[in-house]
Amino acid sequence: MKLKNLRWWVIILIAIATVINYIDRQSLSVLWPEIVEDLYPDESTLERKQIYANISSNFVFSYAFGQAIFGKIFDWVGTRLGFVLAIGVWSIATALHAFAQGVISLSIFRSILGVAEAGNWPGAAKSNAEWFPTKERALAQGIFNSGAAIG
């Protein structure tokens, strides 16, 4: 059985993945006051800010690195398997945050998250090109991009 307008359901699922992607990304900044008290109770305010900055920088550089990696992965394995891989790895990385014991483990988990979450954008762009004719791509792009604003 073929679903009518399947491409619109695909782009909606990508938008939902984008919402989750951005919630994961922003959650550290929201939870940092509690995390820092738990992991670094003896550090000064300045040292805590520096730790946060270092962890955030690791995430950003990992995300940038992941863009190129996942661009190639999506071209190699296709969009379906590429999304399974990206979302699977970022889900595991998110869960691993609960086991962080310090700056090194938290940085590693954030870096893995950054690399994996980076797959969302190349995958979304490739899906858009595969599923939508040229005259509908801008709308589809707008729908999945709205996930970033919501998340």
Task: List the predicted regions and their residue ranges.
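Extracytoplasmic
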Residues: W9-P41
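Cytoplasmic helix-loop-helix junction between adjacent transmembrane helices
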Residues: F109-G147
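Residue-level signature of mid-helix packing/kink "hotspots" within the transmembrane helices
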Residues: Q26, F59-A68, A118
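Hydrophobic transmembrane alpha-helices of multi-pass secondary transporters
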Residues: L6-N21, I55-F59, V89, S105, ...
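Conserved MFS/SLC helix-loop-helix module at the cytosolic interface between two early adjacent transmembrane helices
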Residues: F65-I104
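Extracellular/periplasmic helix-loop-helix junction of adjacent transmembrane segments
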Residues: W32-F65
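Hydrophobic transmembrane alpha-helices of Major Facilitator Superfamily
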Residues: I23, S27, F99, V103, ...
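Transmembrane alpha-helical cores of Major Facilitator Superfamily
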Residues: V19, A53-F61, G88, A95, ...
